[in-house]
Amino acid sequence: WAKRRFPIDTDRVFLSGYSMGGHGTWNIGLRFPDRFAGIAPCAGALTERDIASDPQAKALLGNARNLEPWFTHGENDETEPVANARKLDAALTDMGIHHVYEEIKGGAHLLPLFFGGGNVASLSSWAAPRKRNPAPEKIDYASIGDYADGAFWLRIAKRTGRGTIKLQGTVEKKQNVIRVSAEGPVSDLDVYLDDRLLDFKKKITIEVPGMDPVTVEKVELDNETILESWRSREDPKLVYGARVHVALKRKN
């Protein structure tokens, strides 16, 4: 709605919320990581379970790599245990994901504590220089449901069942090569070709483990792909002119 009515820079959209809004920020932001420049959950949690024993939540947390979260929590929060935030902080550190965690000393579950301390200035300093990279050379994406089809230029085209799907994609710009892999109940992928990453005047090769390479000798721009990619995101930075459908079959 807002993007249709206002001149919004889609590379500068942030998601934040407090308490239940903090829960929503974690869960929405990590499910749709290509929509935001960053997420800033406050006094919320991704899961009420221990992150180490919740494989779906841990898979989603990997989607934070391009979001580099900023989050805060009160030390004495009586509503949402601070232990959940501390475990997220530790998990992100273990995964090598850049983030900022600030704990309010003596703080409870009160919004005025957030506005009354130095958190707003810290949040502003974190957000000010941040911009989404709409054409990342590397994608690590996990989906735990059919609410979303992937991220950026790598999408799930066909699911074969329920369960967690993990996608990885890397563009080797000098070689004009895309390397993709998938785990979980998925049989087909769509790889969108992005001229910010690839030279459309040269042959493009898509490599998948255990399969023969897929070669695109000449990129043909396709109106259907342009329209479909616009409809799926309504984001001018995520519109693509061509795509390659990849059936994940083993070579003979």
How would you name each of these model-derived features?
Residues 1-20, 30-36:
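Gly/Ser-rich "nucleophile elbow"/oxyanion-hole loop immediately N-terminal to the catalytic nucleophile
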Residues 24-28:
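Hydrolases whose catalytic domains are alpha/beta-hydrolase-1, hotdog thioesterase
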Residues 43-128:
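The feature captures the conserved acid-bearing segment of alpha/beta-hydrolase catalytic domains
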Residues 94-252:
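Alpha/beta-hydrolase-fold serine-hydrolase catalytic core, especially in secreted/extracellular enzymes
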Residues 3-7, 30, 90-97, 128-132:
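Sec-exported extracytoplasmic/periplasmic mature domains
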Residues 12, 38, 67-70:
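Proline-centered loop/turn at the N-terminus of a beta-strand
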Residues 7-9, 35, 65, 185, ...:
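Short loop/turn motifs at secondary-structure junctions
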